[in-house]
């Protein structure tokens, strides 16, 4: 089993914030691949399904960003999921909007959700799907940027991008990370 976690904040008014792009990604994966209805457990919401022959547990921590690791740790321990089988979808300031990169391990780069996961898991050696939201230009504008909605002009591209991520998910399930990134880029173009 693989654990795919989308990071975000649970408030309904925050659902379209840039910081919630991880939630948006796992919601689209669940929808496109006919996963089970979301249910509350592990201090979050989970949905289960199969992609590319691989059983996937989707998780949206309902603990707010700063405590996301608590929820991920509970799910990983319950199902005995190794760190190499954990993937987190999160917003990334240092990538332009619409760009996506995958890496394993590394630092939190100021991201409180990743920092929480690093504290709660045995270490930082899980996979990260870094979803670019762009940088507002000055550090004083970062909070307003990540806690703001996507611009109306970005919405069509955002929807194509989320659909591309869901459509390419079978490659991610097989851990074909380079092929996944390439397919997302091609489908979202």
UniProtKB/Swiss-Prot annotation:
Swiss-Prot/TrEMBL site (Discriminates between blocked and unblocked aminoacyl-tRNA) positions: 9
GO biological process entries: protein quality control for misfolded or incompletely synthesized proteins; rescue of stalled ribosome
Catalyzed reactions per annotation: an N-acyl-L-alpha-aminoacyl-tRNA + H2O = an N-acyl-L-amino acid + a tRNA + H(+)
Site (Stabilizes the basic form of H active site to accept a proton): 91
Binding site for tRNA: 64, 66, 112
Keyword Hydrolase attached: yes
Active site: 19
Subcellular location: Cytoplasm
Protein name: Peptidyl-tRNA hydrolase
Lineage of the organism: Bacteria, Pseudomonadati, Pseudomonadota, Alphaproteobacteria, Acetobacterales
Gene name tied to this protein: pth
């Amino acid at each position: 089993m693989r654990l795919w976690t989308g990071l975000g904040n649970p408030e309904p008014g925050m659902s379209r914030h840039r910081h919630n792009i991880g939630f948006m990604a796992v919601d689209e994966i669940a929808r496109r691949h006919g996963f089970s209805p979301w249910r509350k457990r592990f201090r979050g919401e989970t949905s289960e399904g199969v992609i590319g022959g691989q059983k996937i547990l989707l998780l949206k921590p309902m603990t707010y960003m700063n405590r996301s690791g608590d929820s991920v740790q509970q799910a990983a321990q319950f199902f005995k999921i190794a760190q190499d089988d954990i993937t987190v979808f999160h917003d990334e300031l240092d990538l332009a909007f619409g760009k996506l990169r995958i890496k394993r391990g590394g630092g939190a780069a100021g991201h409180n959700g990743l920092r929480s996961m690093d504290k709660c898991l045995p270490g930082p050696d899980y996979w990260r799907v870094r979803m670019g939201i762009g940088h507002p230009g000055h550090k004083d504008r970062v909070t307003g940027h990540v806690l703001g909605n996507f611009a109306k002009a970005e919405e069509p591209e955002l929807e194509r991008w989320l659909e591309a991520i869901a459509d390419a998910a079978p490659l991610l399930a097989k851990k074909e990370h380079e092929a996944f990134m390439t397919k997302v880029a091609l489908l979202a173009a």
